[in-house]
Amino acid sequence: MSGVSRRDVLRAAGVAAAGAGANAAAAGPAGEIRVIASGNGLEATRRGYQLIAEGQDPLDAVVAGVAIVEDDPLDTSVGYGGLPNERGVVELDAAVMHGPSHKAGAVAALQNIRHPAQVALRVLRRTDHVLLVGAGALEFARAHGFHEENLLTENARQIWLQWKERLSSEDDWLPEPEPANAAVEAFFRKNSTVVGDTGRLRFRRPTGTIHCSAINAASDMSCTTTTSGMAFKIPGRVGDSPIIGAGLYVDNTVGSCGSTGRGEANLQNLSSFAAVELMRQGASPEEAGMEILRRIAKTTEPRLRDREGRPDFGINFYIMAKDGRYAGVTMHGEATFAVTDSKGSRLEKCRALYP
């Protein structure tokens, strides 16, 4: 994959030089390579780190890293194998943002293309736009040689079908009399409860996604977020992942932030942009993340709160500052995020607003 165009590099260099006196953070000393990601992105961070160490642009590196997860049929929240919309059709969203040029690209409701982050990268490099959606995004992907395929794996199809069969006792769909395969049963045990003795389910729709941010030795930053979105969503629903300022944001003079979890809560607060702005004002990555979680908790509508008044959904943020400091935060419970740097690759714990 080629680097960012020479024109963009020259433009970014000119902007950086012009603003050096106005923002001392832009002219900090060279640091170390670091790549962070959501908990499902450990291999993505390893791959990204390796490519940056070999001299690739951080944006190319993170897009190549998340492709590992987009290819994984066992990750039901991203790419090939992602859970479909309510009609059984897989729709993917992704965005990329390049720190040095401050350019971004995104696609939403994209069908039949397993690497939406790569398509988003083409939007950044080969168009004057930021976001393409639906049929237009697919036409653009075809024009750039991306291969179309059915993204609905057998595992995802069985999960979708069981969801549809168990959704209501008032329709004509009946659950199969024999238990599903072990993987499907495990999925439903984790994400649902049985209502009475009806066999019907009260289902908590999982919201996965992968976010990945990177910084190189020159302290240039980039990031990407890619997802299959909320499971069994209304066709055409778009979450936070492809929205710049929500699913991800980077300011090369300050830092980056990205999110996984309930996209609607993020969209209503433009959380990634807000987190970076808090860092601009002096907050650490963890302080910025915790403040964003508090804002989301404060604005959550009553139907989405538990008996104690707390948000009953999950949402996580992965934040990195220009100086290399980083943090992962989560609304509640336990969550991890992936890190690869000179100390190696590892999962670290996110700090929870509600432990």
Where are these regions (language model features)?
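N-terminal secretory signal peptides and thylakoid transit peptides that target proteins
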Residues: M1-A17
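Bacterial Sec-dependent signal peptides at the C-terminal "C-region" and cleavage site
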Residues: A20-A30
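Broad, structure-driven detector of short, well-ordered beta-strand segments within folded domains
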Residues: A338-T340
